[in-house]
Every structure is written in C-alpha cells, then in structure tokens.
C-alpha cells in the first residue's frame, strides 16, 4: 500500500513527517502562559470581552495539546474544569474579586500539575508589567498616540 502524503505548495509530506512537526508541550505552554497573562491584564483593565477572548485562545491551545500530546489530555481537561471554568464565570459576571481569586487558584493548579509531571522547576509567574504589545483596557478608552479619534 502506498504511503499517504499531503501535498503543499512546497512539496509533499508524509503523515509521519506531519506528526513530527506538531508543536510540543513547551511551545504550547508558552502560548498558554502568554494567554493567561493577557487574560489577567485584560480583566484588570476592565476589558472583559478581551479577557474572555484570551482565555478562549488558551483553551484552544489545550485542545491542540490534547490531540498532539494525548498523554496530557486528562490533566488538561481536569485543569480546565477546576481552574479555567471558574475564571470564565468571573469574566462572565465581570467580577474582579472573583476573577483575581480564581486566577490565583489557577496559578497554584499550574504548580500542582507541573509537580505531578515531574517538572516542578517550571513555575508560571505573572509579569509585574502589563504586556506592551497589546492594549488591554476598555476599547472605548483606546487612543492611538498622535491620532485624533473621529466622531
């Protein structure tokens, strides 16, 4: 039987080659950490829709990991249920105190799963500064420097 190949504009690839280039947990978790940080600062800035967007993107990264690294699927599902869903509820309720408490529990949950997986040397730490490459506040307050808002 012929080996199944995918055709791209750059050539053909085997299914095994496609499997080999899937992101590992380190790359996925880098995205997760970034989205967790953005979620926090968007909520803190009062941009609840943006906080929900970032948390949804974090969950999308979890879905990718469940497919590409299935041995982590149960832990990712449990983390989502125990830690991310309460954050979503706080975002939905636009409740900063509930959000902050749930977010901190999520940090502890991250520590737990890193310890469980034998990588206790990995610890998420919320950056002290708001990420500067994306506006995190309410959209109606956004103003580009040197540009007058129309209307």
Language-model regions: role of each:
Residues 1-151:
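C-terminal-biased regions
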């Amino acid at each position: 039987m012929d080996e199944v190949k995918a055709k791209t504009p750059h050539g053909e690839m085997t299914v095994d080659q496609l499997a080999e280039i899937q992101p590992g947990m380190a790359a996925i978790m880098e995205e997760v950490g970034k989205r967790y940080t953005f979620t926090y600062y968007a909520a803190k800035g009062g941009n609840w829709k943006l906080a929900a967007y970032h948390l949804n993107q974090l969950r999308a990264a979890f879905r990718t990991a469940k497919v590409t690294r299935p041995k982590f699927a149960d832990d990712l599902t449990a983390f989502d249920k125990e830690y991310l869903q309460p954050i979503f509820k706080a975002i939905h309720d636009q409740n900063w105190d509930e959000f902050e408490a749930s977010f901190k529990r999520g940090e502890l949950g991250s520590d737990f799963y890193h310890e469980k997986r034998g990588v206790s040397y990995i610890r998420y730490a919320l950056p002290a500064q708001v990420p500067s490459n994306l506006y995190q506040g309410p959209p109606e307050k956004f103003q580009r420097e040197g540009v007058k808002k129309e209307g």
